[in-house]
Amino acid sequence: MALPKLESPTYTLEVPSTGEKVKFRPFLVKEQKILMIAEESKDDNQIYDAMETLISSCTFGKVDVKTVNLFDVEYIFLQLRAKSVGEMVELNLLCPDDNKTRVPTKIDLTKLDVDIGEGHTDKIPLTSNITMHMKYPTLDNIRTIDKKGSETNSIFSILKSCIHEVHDGDTIYSRIDIS
């Protein structure tokens, strides 16, 4: 006779950028261990892989981390962490006045929210005829950044990967066609 299988509780979250409801479960001890090993490795790609695997597993495959906006990935990860480890996080923040004093602070992860301001748009007018249409960065965009290069080059690399289209009057140039 087989042992009974323990079921994890399930919760629902709303993906900030789409409003889509996604069911998720807390991460398990073995998944937390994968995260800790990735963190100890100090290898960004190993950390990204661990986050990708964890989010995919805990959302029952409903969230594709490769295509979801980075802020959605961060939000989902924080919600997973809140239900798995604890909703409160204690931090010692460095006081900006003297850069020496540490201030203990508690943050309730369930109260965190993504704020997309009123009038937010993905369009950047360059001239009266030319408009750039942007997309949010993804985890894959962040992975491809050359960490050994200058910070300025990294920023331009992210910006370049976030260009979706350029509109010049009636002509539309897709990112794929832009060199």
Regions found by a protein language model. Name each.
Residues M1-S179:
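Long C-terminal interaction/binding lobes of large macromolecular proteins
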